């Protein structure tokens, strides 16, 4: 249908290409003018462009001249002059599109033009590559040209200090990997001081190998995780303390809200038991939290009603169905508190402190562009999800590679025997061969078979990027045999050695069709670069996964009918077309899966953006008092509303519960009595309580000075938001894991996830307000306030995917360690080495 439509109305990307051709002609027309300039004259053009941009000229206006300047600078510094087709590619990139350019057509050089142009705006440009080696290589090679033109270049790789990272991001152009850019965004939203942030706002990103990052890796979440509860001791201690408390005397239970609160006597007992002066002090946040959870475990949660003990583990009981919910855990430390209550082993939990998928990270840039050799097959996905069109840029010289039809064998053994025979024949002839495999196992199998025949070869499975580039560079030399998984060696060209052209160039031999046509096209594209000779062919068997899944029975029956031998292949265009149809079907399924995941991720994205925006406001604000007062008012209104329902007569309202709550959270023991609020309507009750709380707030501020109070509010706000947000991420993860089961009850899982996720978010916001209000009113203000991280994040760099499509994508995790002399993340106030680090 799409093909027919294009025939009638024409391909829009081709129409755009024609428009861009006119701009490219303007760039070329300026060539002589730029050649006549001295090096200094060329460099001064950068300052001239910056001034013109500030005076109102758009980047589009500057494009022809700017590209002509880069073209001339590339000739002088890199000894490379971009071809007319490369200028076309560069124009498509500036327009926020994807330039599909065949291997060897100089994508890296093409990228320099839009990068230079967009850097003139002074808002920063990120050049994103798939690995550190390519980022380093490109920043050095292309960086020399940018520096010649007076722009600064930064390199963002793992292991840099905050200062080094900040410097890299302050540069006009920053090179780095997708993982590192994503992790820095997450870490910036966990800082305690605005000065600790390293990234600027996300302006323009140019993504190299865009299909790999935005499609293959799209579902991979970047996760910063940390062990929040480093010690399980506090759970046991809180449990022992709570066991001896008496109802009404030491704590009160609100039946409606199922919340438990310590009375004044209970607080005194806790301070004596733990030998501390003030339970509400900032240093004892963790202790108070553990006591509250232990009380909830003992008073609110009942064995065999809310949970059961099975095989030494706490299993939650679903309150609606009565079914056991294995694998689910209560959040916020309640699960560990119940484990302590029941005398079971207390599990340490690693929590997600922050996470984001590449899809959502890259969609935050003002403008996004990408380059790859293969994107047209995924055009619909790029357009729907990222709003980017794919422009197929013509090659500088026609491709003369001979793409032969697939060879199909009955069995895998017969296929591999034929593969090795072919390699041996080509090796004897001296023609270089690149053997493409779908998985590491296959590459090792082919390697073993070649060793038996004593054929020297190199195996590449993306374990060493530096060595990988060297092997790939030599893969076009006479007699070279290279086995590579599909992803290995992307971004490095295979140049033909001496005398290889006469032998037919590089031969690419695929041992299996990938479920994505794009990956097969990438493998083919390794040969026949820039008009070089070359050939490619895929060897398949009826036992390959793709063939097994899609209609190989008919073909096998046909082979049997023809009485074909095991090692006798079918070579047929018809078969190749059938395989391609199967691939299209798989690609469609994968696209649907990614789209669905994105819909779920969007729920979390909206929530994350709200929290991060508010967190930023807290960091930037000098006075949070107004926000805290609003939070206090919300807390009072909610509690009063709960205990003064319209459905009851005022005589039945629970005034006692209101007074107990206010004493426990906002006021002193003598500040409020039931008599003060008896007979008043809810609005009056709220007003009376609010006035009393603000009076206490003012006294506190006089006592500790406004300056200390402002920092104190900030410390409490950041700590509370971070801890509650972490728990919320955890709860949302748990909700998502079980949500698909709702489909059995004729409910739409996505709608349910949105609805429940929103309810959970609202509950989290209410919980943040309650905790901030309580600590501001109850905690002592310390003179030497320190903002402390709620938990130490941890990061693990992802392992290369090796092109193994069968390997399940693992989340990318980042871990960060605690210094021995730093404050312990558990919140005890001691140094790490004297506390949890013993």
From Swiss-Prot:
Subcellular location: Cell membrane; Cytoplasm
Name of the top EC class for this enzyme: translocase
Catalysed reaction, written as an equation: ATP + H2O + cellular proteinSide 1 = ADP + phosphate + cellular proteinSide 2
The keyword Hydrolase is annotated on this UniProt entry: no
MF terms in GO: ATP binding; metal ion binding; protein-exporting ATPase activity
Stretch list, region Disordered: 517-536, 789-838
Entries under PROSITE patterns matching the protein: SECA, SECA_MOTOR_DEAD
Cofactor note: May bind 1 zinc ion per subunit.
InterPro entries xref list: Helicase_ATP-bd, Helicase_C-like, P-loop_NTPase, SEC_C_motif, SecA, SecA_CS, SecA_DEAD, SecA_motor_DEAD
Gene3D superfamilies recorded: Helical scaffold and wing domains of SecA, P-loop containing nucleotide triphosphate hydrolases, SecA, preprotein cross-linking domain
Keywords, ordered alphabetically: ATP-binding, Cell membrane, Cytoplasm, Membrane, Metal-binding, Nucleotide-binding, Protein transport, Translocase, Translocation, Transport, Zinc
A GO biological process held by the record: protein transport by the Sec complex
UniProt cofactor(s): Zn(2+)
Positions with biased composition (Basic and acidic residues): 801-819
Binding site for Zn(2+): 824, 826, 835-836
Membrane topology: Peripheral membrane protein
GO cellular component terms, A-Z: cell envelope Sec protein transport complex; cytosol; plasma membrane
Pfam families: P-loop_SecA, SEC-C, SecA_DEAD, SecA_PP_bind, SecA_SW
Catalytic activity, EC: 7.4.2.8
Chain sites annotated for binding ATP: 86, 104-108, 493
Complexes and interactors: Monomer and homodimer. Part of the essential Sec protein translocation apparatus which comprises SecA, SecYEG and auxiliary proteins SecDF. Other proteins may also be involved.
Homology family: Belongs to the SecA family.
Function: Part of the Sec protein translocase complex. Interacts with the SecYEG preprotein conducting channel. Has a central role in coupling the hydrolysis of ATP to the transfer of proteins into and across the cell membrane, serving as an ATP-driven molecular motor driving the stepwise translocation of polypeptide chains across the membrane.
Protein name: Protein translocase subunit SecA
């Amino acid at each position: 249908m799409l093909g027919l439509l294009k025939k009638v109305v024409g391909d829009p990307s081709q129409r755009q290409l024609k428009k861009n051709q006119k701009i490219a002609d303007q760039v070329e027309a300026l060539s002589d003018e730029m050649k006549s300039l001295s090096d200094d004259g060329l460099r001064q053009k950068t300052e001239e462009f910056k001034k013109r941009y500030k005076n109102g000229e758009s980047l589009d206006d500057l494009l022809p001249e700017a590209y002509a300047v880069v073209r001339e600078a590339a000739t002088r510094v890199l000894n490379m002059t971009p071809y007319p087709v490369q200028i076309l590619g560069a124009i498509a990139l500036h327009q926020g599109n994807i330039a599909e350019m065949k291997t060897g057509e100089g994508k890296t050089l093409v990228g320099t033009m839009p990068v230079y142009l967009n850097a003139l705006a002074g808002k920063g440009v990120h050049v994103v590559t798939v690995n550190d080696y390519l980022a380093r290589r490109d920043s050095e090679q292309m960086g020399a040209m940018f520096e010649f033109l007076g722009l600064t270049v930064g390199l963002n790789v793992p292991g840099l200090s905050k200062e080094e990272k900040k410097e890299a991001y302050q540069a006009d152009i920053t090179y780095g990997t997708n993982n590192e850019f994503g992790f820095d965004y997450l870490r910036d939203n966990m800082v305690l001081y605005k000065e600790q942030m390293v990234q600027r706002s996300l302006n323009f990103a140019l993504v190299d190998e865009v299909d790999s990052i935005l499609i293959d890796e799209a579902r991979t979440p970047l996760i910063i995780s940390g062990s929040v509860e480093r010690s399980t001791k506090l759970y046991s201690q809180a449990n022992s303390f709570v066991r001896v408390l008496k109802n009404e005397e030491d704590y009160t239970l609100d039946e409606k809200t199922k919340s438990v609160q310590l009375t004044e006597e209970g607080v005194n007992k806790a301070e004596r038991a733990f030998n501390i002066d003030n339970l509400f002090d900032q240093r004892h946040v963790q202790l108070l939290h553990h006591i509250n959870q232990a009380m909830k475990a003992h008073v609110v949660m009942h064995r065999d009603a809310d949970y059961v003990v099975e095989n030494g583990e706490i299993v939650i009981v679903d309150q609606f169905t009565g079914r056991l919910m294995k694998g689910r855990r209560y959040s916020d430390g309640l699960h560990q508190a119940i484990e302590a209550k029941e005398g079971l082993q207390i599990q340490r939990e690693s929590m997600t402190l922050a996470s984001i998928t590449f899809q959502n990270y890259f969609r935050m840039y003002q403008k996004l562009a990408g380059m790859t050799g293969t994107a047209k097959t995924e055009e619909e996905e790029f357009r729907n999800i990222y709003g980017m069109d794919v422009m197929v840029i013509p090659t500088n010289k026609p491709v003369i590679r001979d793409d032969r039809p697939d060879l199909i064998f009955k069995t895998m053994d017969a296929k591999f025997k034929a593969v090795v025979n072919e390699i041996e024949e080509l090796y004897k002839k001296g023609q270089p061969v690149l053997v493409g495999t779908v998985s590491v196992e296959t590459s090792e199998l082919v390697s073993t078979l070649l060793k038996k025949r004593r054929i020297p070869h190199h195996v590449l499975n993306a374990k060493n990027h530096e060595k990988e580039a060297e092997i790939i560079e030599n893969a076009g030399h006479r007699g070279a045999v290279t086995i590579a998984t599909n992803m290995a060696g992307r971004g490095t060209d295979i140049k033909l050695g001496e005398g290889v052209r006469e032998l037919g160039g590089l031969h690419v031999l695929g041992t299996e069709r990938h479920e994505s046509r794009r990956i097969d096209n990438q493998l083919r594209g390794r040969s026949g670069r820039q008009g070089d000779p070359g050939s490619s062919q895929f060897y398949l068997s009826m036992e390959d996964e793709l063939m097994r899944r899609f209609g190989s029975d008919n073909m096998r029956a046909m082979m049997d009918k023809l009485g074909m031998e095991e090692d006798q292949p079918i070579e047929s265009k018809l078969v190749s077309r059938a395989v391609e149809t199967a691939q299209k079907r798989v690609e469609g399924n994968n696209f649907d899966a990614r789209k669905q995941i994105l819909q779920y991720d969007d729920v979390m994205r909206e929530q994350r953006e709200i929290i991060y925006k508010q967190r930023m406001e807290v960091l930037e604000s000098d006075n949070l008092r107004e926000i805290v007062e609003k939070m206090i008012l919300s807390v009072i209104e909610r509690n009063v509303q709960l205990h003064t329902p319209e459905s009851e007569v005022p005589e039945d309202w629970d005034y006692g519960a209101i007074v107990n709550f206010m004493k426990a959270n906002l006021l002193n023991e003598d500040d409020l009595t039931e008599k003060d609020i008896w007979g008043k309507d809810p609005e009056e009750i709220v007003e009376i309580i609010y006035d009393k709380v603000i009076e206490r707030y003012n006294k506190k501020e006089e006592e500790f000075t406004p300056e200390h109070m402002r920092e104190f509010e900030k410390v409490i706000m950041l700590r509370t938001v971070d801890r509650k947000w972490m728990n919320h991420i955890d709860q949302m993860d748990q909700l998502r894991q079980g949500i698909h089961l709702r489909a059995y009850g004729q409910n739409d899982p996505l709608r349910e996830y949105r609805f429940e996720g929103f309810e959970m978010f609202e509950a989290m916001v209410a919980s943040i307000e309650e905790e901030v209000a309580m600590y501001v009113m109850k905690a002592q203000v310390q003179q030497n306030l320190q903002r402390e991280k709620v938990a130490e994040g941890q990061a693990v760099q992802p392992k290369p995917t090796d092109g193994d499509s069968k390997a399940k994508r693992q989340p990318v995790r980042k871990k960060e360690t605690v210094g021995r002399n730093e404050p312990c993340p558990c919140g005890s106030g001691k140094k790490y080495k004297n506390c949890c680090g013993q």
